Amino acid sequence: MTTIVPTPSPSPHPDPAQAVASPDEIVRNPIEGVPMPLSHRVSLSAIWTVVRITVARQGRGIRLLILAVLFSLPIVIAVLTRRFQDPYQPESAEGALILGLIFQALLPVSALLFASGMVQDDIEEQTLTYFLIRPIPRWAIYLAKLLGTFVVTAMRALVFTIATLVTIYWGEDGLIKPVLTERAPIIVALVALSLSAYVAIFGGLSLWVRRTLVFGAIYIVVFEGVFANIDFVIREATVMYHVRVLAVRWLDMPGADWSIDLSTAPAASTCLIVLLTVSTVFAAFGALTFGMREFRVKTPEGS
């Protein structure tokens, strides 16, 4: 008599322990439809893309036109001064236009105009979502946008500042040396230091207050305008004071005009540390705020 043994059919509900591959199998078989873990490294190419988009966006629009008009004023004033001042004194014109008008007014105003819209423009144009869904940490997105804003502001400011310097010393014996070969690089460094601090300050301010332009204008007038000119300890909390100390030490500007006594003023290294620390701290707090904040992004339907 023959005994027939039935062949067992596969269970419709397999054992989960048998269905799930072990970690070793996942590593050995990465191409068999098993999801691979995402890398936690920051993509430099993705960050560079954010920087390029920010530069392209900040390089157009009414802000750029306003910046061009504002920075044309020192050039026009320099031309008029050369025409009507008798005798013409280029050193005094440099102090009034470069260290006075540009550094005390135009640089902080230009930083405010661009940094205040650094994030808000993406919200208004409904493009912030495209940044947030990319595989980039939020803090890296903010720092990339901050870098792009600084590049745009600094490049425009440097072009007009050097143009003003050339206009002031045009036709003078020292135009090439020492003006363009010695003084101009120092002025470029001071512009970069000033804007790095101002862009970081106003970039963070745009995340902390609603009316950034109003509060930024108040800061410029009160702190960088009034407090920086008062011979009291509070002026050491301003960007303008440390920039002026560097200008007095590096450019031999007359410190008496700003009540700066080099025997009691901070050393150049101290001023550099203060300016770089301000830039770093405000950039870090801005990145932290951007990383934790929930944004109400507008949609085409208005929701």
Predicted regions and their residues:
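Membrane-interacting alpha-helical segments
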Residues: 44-48, 52-59, 140, 182, ...
